[in-house]
Curated annotation (Swiss-Prot):
Annotated InterPro entries: MecA_C_sf, Neg-reg_MecA
Chain's role: Enables the recognition and targeting of unfolded and aggregated proteins to the ClpC protease or to other proteins involved in proteolysis. Acts negatively in the development of competence by binding ComK and recruiting it to the ClpCP protease. When overexpressed, inhibits sporulation. Also involved in Spx degradation by ClpC.
Domain comment as written in the entry: The N-terminal domain has binding sites for ComK and probably for unfolded/aggregated proteins; the C-terminal domain interacts with ClpC.
Protein name: Adapter protein MecA 2
Family: Belongs to the MecA family.
Taxonomic source organism: Halalkalibacterium halodurans (strain ATCC BAA-125 / DSM 18197 / FERM 7344 / JCM 9153 / C-125)
Keywords for the protein's UniProt record, in alphabetical order: Competence, Sporulation
Top-rank taxon, per record: Bacteria
GO biological process: establishment of competence for transformation; negative regulation of establishment of competence for transformation; negative regulation of sporulation resulting in formation of a cellular spore; sporulation resulting in formation of a cellular spore
Annotated S-S bridges: none
Entry-linked PANTHER family: ADAPTER PROTEIN MECA (PTHR39161), ADAPTER PROTEIN MECA 1 (PTHR39161:SF1)
């Protein structure tokens, strides 16, 4: 994927359909499956943040051009107006040349919904064991998956149970034992192996003793 920083508020991507498929996405589903389209978009924005220090914050104006060999996406950060922003991942409409363009404003509400889940990678399985014995909040959804030699914990919070500050605090505790992964959970689930599909930390705690 090519990333070009246009200015302080704008970044341009070019991603081929081959690259999209190599990331575990189908080139058609990203248009018709909103959740999958969002996953790809957030994965791309994470790379932009890592490579160009372009943070995903505030309202974003998105232009998508569907080209013959891939997608050209221009993302511009705007200013928050009246503190109310709405997120919507764009869907393109093709013209007679098989190319299309769509512009859309992202909404903060859906971005916050996306931010309530995280994929945590671990350098060693023992780090997961240590986490399980030092983190005793069991009423969050968590799944353990093995993918390409690494263990990943997919964690989903219930925003009706915990406040945003409480979730941030819990994430900070968990990230003391692992790292936030940029990989999509869909890619990990599709090509990896599910080790424990629910209550993973509880199961690990019960099956593996705490290290001395």
């Amino acid at each position: 994927m090519e990333i070009e920083r246009i200015n302080d508020s704008t970044v341009k991507f070019f991603i081929t359909y081959k690259d999209i498929e190599s990331r575990g996405f189908d080139r058609d589903e990203i248009w018709y499956n909103r959740e999958r389209g969002e996953e790809l978009f957030f994965e791309m924005m994470n790379e932009a943040n890592d490579r160009e220090d372009f943070e995903l914050e505030g309202p974003l104006w998105i232009q998508v051009h569907a080209l013959e060999k891939g997608l050209e996406i221009v993302v511009t950060r705007g200013q928050i107006s009246d503190g109310n922003v709405k997120l919507e991942i764009p869907v393109t409409q093709e013209d007679g040349d098989g190319q299309g363009q769509e512009s859309s404003m992202m909404t903060e509400d859906d971005f916050l919904e996306e931010s309530l889940e995280i994929v945590i990678g671990f350098a060693d399985f023992e780090d997961i064991v240590d986490l399980s014995h030092n983190f005793f909040i069991d009423d969050i959804n968590n799944t353990l998956v093995h993918f390409e030699g690494t263990y990943y914990l997919h964690v989903v919070f219930n925003d009706e149970t915990y406040s945003e500050d409480e979730q941030d605090d819990m994430l900070s505790q968990m990230l003391e034992y692992g790292y936030e992964s940029d990989l999509s959970i869909y890619r990990i689930m599709e090509y990896g192996k599910v080790i424990i599909d629910s209550n993973a930390l509880t199961v690990v705690r019960e099956q593996f003793p705490k290290r001395a």
